[in-house]
A protein has these predicted regions:
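Short, acidic, metal-binding catalytic loop of nucleotide-sugar glycosyltransferases
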Residues: 25-34
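A conserved acidic beta->alpha catalytic loop
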Residues: 26, 41-50, 67
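Conserved donor NDP-sugar-binding/catalytic core segment of glycosyltransferases
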Residues: 95-133, 137-144
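Active-site-adjacent helix/loop segment of glycosyltransferases
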Residues: 10, 209-298
């Protein structure tokens, strides 16, 4: 029997051949040979799987899922079949450089982190931090995520910050290192979330169990972003507003009605802003998200 490898990099793909062609070469170049490389295909209807088997069968293992399970459940199902001591969940639109695996693993060992991510910068403008994690994720009291180097949509230049190793509240799902023991302890992602906020939810649950999460400042990866859902997608807005509420209600300690009143007010203002811009689909996405959450309240 083959021994369990120390690390496995797992890329979840859905109709992303264009991203695989662009970004997979950097993963192949900068990932050590003793690290397993997997692409878990989420029921793609393009020729991603055929292309991988034709061009990279000797290095990349392909796991085909029968349908698009979304980011959260897709990874849950994929990792049931992949053995490793540490998983690296890597978006298909991420470009890696240097000793990105080994350096991050060393930081995890040094600080005792169960979950970590490197600094995430923009692929098209690598001087600037990227929305999905930047230099470490945090959450404010009203359930709005922010990052070191990123507030809402405003991202700082990486050179303007002290990019040291630091403990954070959540790690970027674009390049997400997690110990297998922690993954199993938390039972993976919440598949009901489908996509968005799943890494925040998992990190929060693990922190409630006593685990620590960090950002490794010694490595930067470059993320394109919007690879599956564009920023102005009503479905993306629905998932973001719905999942933010669900994650807060599930993990936050305290009196939930008071929190819900605040979020109803703040999200209502966001919906009115969409309405003032003529973005009717985005406006309805906020209302639909709240309706889906209210149906789950006790």
């Amino acid at each position: 029997m083959r021994p369990i490898p120390e690390t496995a990099v797992v890329i979840l793909n859905w109709n992303g051949r264009r991203h695989l062609e662009t970004y997979l070469p950097s993963v192949l170049k900068h990932t050590p040979e003793d690290v397993d490389l997997w692409v878990a295909d989420n029921g793609s209807t393009d020729d991603s799987v055929a292309w991988l088997k034709e061009h990279h069968a000797s290095r990349v293992s392909v796991l085909s899922l029968e349908q698009n399970w979304g980011f959260a459940e897709g990874y849950n199902r994929a990792l049931q079949s992949i053995q490793a001591e540490t998983y690296v969940l890597l978006n298909s639109d991420v470009r890696v450089v240097g000793d990105w695996v080994g350096s991050t693993l060393m930081a995890m060992a040094e600080y005792g982190w169960d979950v970590a991510s490197p600094v995430v910068v923009q692929d098209l403008n690598p001087e600037r931090l990227e929305h999905a994690g930047a230099a470490g994720g945090w959450m404010d009291v009203d359930g709005f995520p922010f990052c070191v180097g990123r507030i809402f949509k405003q991202c700082d230049n990486a050179s303007d910050l002290d990019l040291r190793d630091r403990e954070t509240f959540w790690a970027s799902g674009a390049c997400f290192f997690i110990r297998r023991s922690a993954w199993l302890k938390a039972n993976g992602f919440d598949g009901d979330l489908f996509a968005h906020f799943e890494e925040i939810d998992l990190c929060w649950r693990l922190k409630n169990m006593g685990s620590s999460v960090g950002c490794h400042g010694g490595v930067q990866v470059r993320h394109l972003g919007g690879g599956s859902l564009p920023s102005e997608s009503p479905f993306k807005a629905y998932l973001n507003f719905r999942n933010a509420l669900l994650v807060m209600l599930k993990n936050r300690r305290g009196w939930w009605p008071g929190f819900m009143v605040r979020r109803m007010t703040l999200d209502g203002l966001a919906a009115l802003r969409f309405l003032s811009q003529g973005k009717w689909a985005m406006f309805w996405a906020v209302g639909k998200a709240h309706g889906a959450v209210y149906l789950r309240l006790p």
